[in-house]
Amino acid sequence: MRKACFFLTIVTIFLFSGIIAFSQENPSDKATVPFSNPSKPGRVEASVHNGGITVKGYEGKEVIVEARAREKKLSEEDVNVAVAQRAAREAARALGRAVPEEKKKAEEKAAKAAGMRLIQSVTTGLTVEEVNNVMDISVESFKRAVDLIIQVPYSTSLELSAFNNGDIVIENVSGEIEVNNHNGALKLSGVSGVVVASTFNGDVTVNFIKVAPEKPMSFSTWNGDIDVTFPADIKANVKMKSQRGDIYSDFDIKLMATPPSAVEDKRKEGGKYRISIGEYTSGTINGGGPEFQFNTFNGNIFIRKAK
């Protein structure tokens, strides 16, 4: 298999390929990047500190990335939060707490760029790196919000994260999806793989065409509703919890008794006997299957059957 390390900054792309659109007042940068082995499903990892991410599946084999800066600049408080978070991540990596995959990728990037000078972008700071069918996409969004619009082959797996000022939207993707937001909604439609979706302030809305068999999934938020639509024939064990909301479904969910999650007996030492019952409501759909977990604090849960 051919191995490649593909590293781009927008300035470099401009010099060699001419595929960048640039507006001084409202920058917009674009890059088209192939996977090392386009015959196999790839993986895209993208992160934005301030802004949103939209990913759409299409019939092509390359990843098309566009970064669009918003006209409204961020407040000084937003900038300080983003800078502090980035510094914390870099400090953790410097202390050797990065996962092995990150360390390996960092070593490969360093070797490839040995003796070369990094040219920083003066636009959205769009950076795309590709190693062994894994593509990493990031932007500089400290002083103004930047939105990422990405087109990927249908079977691409995704790992996406955002923090402020934007939603994450995914359409027509069949790979595995892990998506995290902090202040924004998650909106997934036409997906047909495994989904792990989490946000803090925002709704989680997912519409499945089909689900991967025997794979667990999780959907969670703190302030918001969870609304997930599944094919009618899914088989699953479901665990559902809403502290300050209700749970609704048009599936025939067979509820199960919730066993104690903890039993503690300290009576011999003069203490107490304590039983703690789990807060989740559990049940099965169509006889049961992999575990699907739904968890919100301030919001309702809707588990829908596709019509």
Give the residues covered by each predicted segment.
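Acidic (Asp/Glu) and glycine-rich low-complexity loops/linkers
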Residues: A21-S47, G52-S161, N172, E178, ...
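Bacterial N-terminal signal peptides that target proteins for export
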Residues: M1-T9
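Bacterial N-terminal signal peptides
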Residues: L8-G18
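Beta-strand-rich extracellular passenger or scaffold domains
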Residues: L158, I168, T205-V206, I226-V228, ...
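Hydrophobic lipid-interacting interfaces of membrane-associated proteins
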Residues: R70, G166, G184, G202, ...
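Right-handed parallel beta-helix
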Residues: S161-N201
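Flexible, glycine-rich surface segments
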Residues: G193, S198-T199, F208-V238
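C-terminal/domain-terminus segments
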Residues: F297-K307
